[in-house]
A protein has these predicted regions:
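NAD(P)+-binding Rossmann beta1-loop-alpha1 motif at the extreme N-terminus of oxidoreductases
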Residues: 1-51, 58-61, 68, 89
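Rossmann-like NAD(P)(H) cofactor-binding subdomain of soluble oxidoreductases
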Residues: 53, 64, 68-69, 73-144
Length: 144
């Protein structure tokens, strides 16, 4: 199975490490420098400094629009605050693949954002229903 994990924090990286021996996994990070550092050291020094990244794990900062068509399953391992903009950006390209989010909590008002959500306090599935309805979507929960 081709897995695309969007978000190279601790949670996304841990899942990528665990899944890569059994699946073709691409771990996507939003910052090119982060990807380059992980490729060079085969470690995610910022989030999981004690864990080596398997050689078979693909690390990418390529546009998600290029990676999504190849994915059998997309895991969104971002903070809850990034879910709405991410789904707004890639939602139209996710019609065929199942997607699961790993974010915890609810959508809070970001005082640094230009515009607050119309209805703050939404859970991830509520944000998904508003922003990208019709997805084959689910949730994967883990450590708190």
């Amino acid at each position: 199975m081709n897995l695309l994990i969007v978000g190279a924090g601790a949670w996304g990286t841990a899942l990528a490490i665990q899944a890569s021996p059994r699946h073709q996994v691409t771990l996507w990070a939003r910052h090119a420098a982060h990807v380059q550092a992980m490729q060079t050291t085969r470690m995610n020094q910022r989030y999981l400094p004690q864990q080596r990244l398997p050689e078979e794990l693909t690390l990418s900062h390529d546009p998600l629009s290029q990676l999504l068509p190849q994915a059998d399953l997309v895991l969104l391992a971002t903070p809850m605050s990034a879910l709405r903009p991410l789904l707004t950006d890639i939602g139209p390209a996710l019609s065929a693949q199942p997607v699961a989010w790993l974010c915890k909590g609810f959508e809070a008002v970001d005082p640094n954002a230009g515009a607050a959500p119309a209805k703050p306090g939404l859970m991830a599935h509520e944000v998904q229903t508003l922003v990208a309805p019709g997805l084959h979507a689910g949730v994967l929960s883990g450590p708190s």
